[in-house]
Amino acid sequence: MATVFRPLERLRVPRPSLHPGVTGSGSACCRCTLGAKRYLLTDNIVKLKEFQHKKIAIAYNLPGTKEIYFRNLEEKLTQNKLILKEELKTLLYLCQSLEDVQLAKAVIYRYHAENKNFTLGEYKFGPVFMRLCYELDLEDSAVELVRDKHLQGFFLDSTSFNILMDMLFTKGKYERALQVLIEMKNQDVRFSKETYILAFAICYKLNTLESLKICTTLREEALIKGDIICRRAYCFVVALALNKNQLKNAVSIFSQIVNPESIVCINLNILIHIQSNMLESLLKILEDSLDTNLSKFVRRHTFSEEVLAKVREKLKDSPALIARFDEVYGKLHVNGQITVHSLDALLCHVPRDKRSNLLLLKKRAVSHRTLQPLSRSLLTE
């Protein structure tokens, strides 16, 4: 390709704009009313509950006390003795405070210095440490370690960086989250599907032309690498492009979304029509969503009250069009096709993890009543 890409590490970390266009009120995801504690990663990635359950189990089965265990490790450090893998693993699960984490950091440095040349196939401590920091709200400690040159190679997996970026995103620390993303790229850690979601969400929250350029760079590099960018990630870029009045860019990205039938895509499409001045087509979309021939089991399109307010504002100078809109709006309201959630809240809401249902199905192989194996036909039903 003839296009020259700017390396991501050379891009300046942009300061977030205080007046995003799409979100209206500019409400942050941590004020989202959808009831989720995290707003980007699903439970099967963060695994916080699983981590906490394991902490309880390890503490219960520990021979002796936590204080004795910690004292033995401190002696090993002062006597320059070898740190074993199981010792570090147990230590991470026993930590309950910032003081405990300080000891864990010292042990991590020693362990990595002793084992950095033997990382292939080794146990990944990075995600465990990040879950510990997530639980204790110690994002500063996590950022310090991932950016420390002496620990290069310790955080080799995308999950560690993803959990840290999610932690920073949830707390509204978007600039620091972008710095972690840049560090991840500089360390040549392979991006996962979740990484692209986080990266584009961070750029969307920064809400600057510079952050939009970062999205463009990442999309082009993903194309070269053959990485797949999911619909949810693309939606953040479309919203950002619309915020910055980059309509052509927004339309181009939206056209790449496969099956744009989600509630977020439906509302982004309405905003694209508003900025394109395609008012007749816009009203046709709203009217078609009222199709009375649809089965009650088919999910109808749902529109954000915030987005519909923008439609009304756009149509206010045309009495004929505003009359049509008011009629459609009333019917949408009666049908329950209007949500009070803003587009920002819808973008940041974590979709339900489908894999958890599959795991339950796999686990349920024996009848609770007869204690006999369930038949294949029953499982398929």
UniProtKB/Swiss-Prot annotation:
Print the keywords alphabetically. Mitochondrion, mRNA processing, Phosphoprotein
One matching Pfam family, short form? Answer: MRP-S27
Q: Where in the cell is it found?
A: Mitochondrion
The annotated phenotype of a deletion mutant is: Deficient mice shown deficiency of the third complex of the respiratory chain that caused profound ultrastructural changes in the heart. The outer layers of ventricular cardiomyocytes appeared to be infiltrated with macrovesicular fat deposits, having the appearance of adipocytes.
Phosphoserine modification sites are S375
Q: GO CC: one term? A: mitochondrion
What name does the UniProt record give this protein? Answer: Pentatricopeptide repeat-containing protein 2, mitochondrial
Task: Identify the tissues in which this protein is expressed.
Answer: High expression in heart and liver and low expression in kidney, brain and testis.
Which family would the database say this protein is a member of?
Belongs to the PTCD2 family.
- InterPro entries, per the entry: mS27/PTCD2 (IPR034913), Pentatricopeptide_rpt (IPR002885), PTCD2 (IPR034629), TPR-like_helical_dom_sf (IPR011990)
- Naturally occurring in which organism (per UniProt): Mus musculus (Mouse)
* Any one GO BP annotation for this protein: regulation of gene expression
| Entry keyword annotation includes Lipid metabolism | no
Function according to Swiss-Prot or TrEMBL: Involved in mitochondrial RNA maturation and mitochondrial respiratory chain function.
Q: Does the keyword Phosphoprotein apply?
A: yes
PPR repeat ranges per the UniProt record? 159-193
